[in-house]
């Protein structure tokens, strides 16, 4: 008879216990085993005994990949594998990959991939830090046999807000206007009632808003989010701002 199962938040600890019986005590014995799969490797341990002997075994194994950015450590690698690259996004788990999480730099190893087929790698958004918003949460790659391919994710790291923008006369900024950060690297479209969602914002900066070519069809917002109250530093906020 025996029992087995999985434990921990990501079910990355698998274990089993078995016990056997024989006539007049002959063949009596028991065994237990555990396998812990984590970000930086895999740890196995087993113990069994019978009438004549006791045995204990254990081991640790993992994989190391040197690439152009850093060295990434993970679980034992198959001949075909995937490198997740999400700079600055640490501790995020990968769906359907037991124990795989991004390291402190934002890299992770998916130890096994299917060659010459589409492999979809999806990050678990429930494990994202509060100050991170991903442009895409899943990527599809097609590796050749024996290759290591990269699944790269672009993250906006910073504050997340919904700005309710109004013009000088108090009317909302028109639907469809383009709101751009002063560095021009991030654009968002204004929705109903002058509201625009922005992620990865710095504490302060300038937002340029444009819905036409004339000077009357554009405005700008100077923001300083550190002066606004909120439930926590990186929680979602809804803030009213005048656009001049």
Question: For each of these PLM feature ranges, what is it?
Answer:
Residues 1-178, 185-191, 197-244:
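Flexible, glycine-rich linker and terminal segments associated
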């Amino acid at each position: 008879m025996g029992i087995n199962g999985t434990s921990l938040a990501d079910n990355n600890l698998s274990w089993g216990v078995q016990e056997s019986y024989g006539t007049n005590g002959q063949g009596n014995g028991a065994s237990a085993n555990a396998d812990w799969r984590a970000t930086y490797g895999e740890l196995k341990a087993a113990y069994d005994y019978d009438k004549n002997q006791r045995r204990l075994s254990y081991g640790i194994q993992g994989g190391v990949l040197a690439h152009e950015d850093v060295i990434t450590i993970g679980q034992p690698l198959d001949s075909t594998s995937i490198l997740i690259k999400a700079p600055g996004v640490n501790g995020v788990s990968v769906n359907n990959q037991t124990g795989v999480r991004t390291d402190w730099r934002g890299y992770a190893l998916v130890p096994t991939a299917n060659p010459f087929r589409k492999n979809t790698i999806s990050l678990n958004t429930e494990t994202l830090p509060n100050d991170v918003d991903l442009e895409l949460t899943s990527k599809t790659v097609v590796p050749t046999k024996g290759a290591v391919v990269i699944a790269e994710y672009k993250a906006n790291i910073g504050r997340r807000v919904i700005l309710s923008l109004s013009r000088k006369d108090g009317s909302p900024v028109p639907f469809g206007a383009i709101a751009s950060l002063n560095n021009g690297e991030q654009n968002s479209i204004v929705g109903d009632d002058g509201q625009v969602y922005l992620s990865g914002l710095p504490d302060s900066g300038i937002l340029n808003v444009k819905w036409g070519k004339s000077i009357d069809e554009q405005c700008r917002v100077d923001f300083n989010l550190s002066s606004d109250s909120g439930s926590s530093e990186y929680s979602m906020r809804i803030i009213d701002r005048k656009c001049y």
